[in-house]
Amino acid sequence: WKGFTLPGGHVERGESIVDAVIREMKEETGLTISNPKLCGVKQFPIDNGRYIVFLFTADKYTGELISSDEGTMHWVDKDELSSVNTVSDLNELLQVMLDDNLSEFQYVIEDGEWKMILK
């Protein structure tokens, strides 16, 4: 992916989800985050199941932002997001992450078409 997206990754065997968030942030950004908070879930159907993404926020960190094998890292102000190339559903992801009345971002397939639902 050549545009802007959020850091992400996977949970390793035996690792807690929170520990995976802390590890992935360190690996991808160079930042050590404290007290990540689960703020939403994104899910979509795959072959015989579904893929689930846990969305976290963290407001405390130490370290300096660095680039990694994942790409060049930059801070982007929320007001500037509309002027940069982002993943197509970044606005909806941020909406779920920042709106206390939302907790789920779901893709469903209806009549052969992908549909986005925010709950």
Regions found by a protein language model. Give the residues of each.
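Conserved Nudix-box catalytic region and its N-terminal flanking loop in Nudix hydrolases
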Residues: W1-K26, G112-K119
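C-terminal regulatory/oligomerization modules of transcriptional regulators
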Residues: D99-K119
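NUDIX/MutT-family hydrolases
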Residues: I66-M97, K115-K119
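Active-site-adjacent beta-strand/loop module that shapes the phosphate/pyrophosphate-binding cleft
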Residues: F44-E64, N91-M97, N101
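Short aromatic/basic micro-patch
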Residues: T5, L55, W75
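A short coil-to-beta-strand element that immediately follows conserved catalytic motifs
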Residues: T32-G40
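Short connector loops at helix/strand junctions that flank enzyme active sites
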Residues: L6, I33, G49-V53
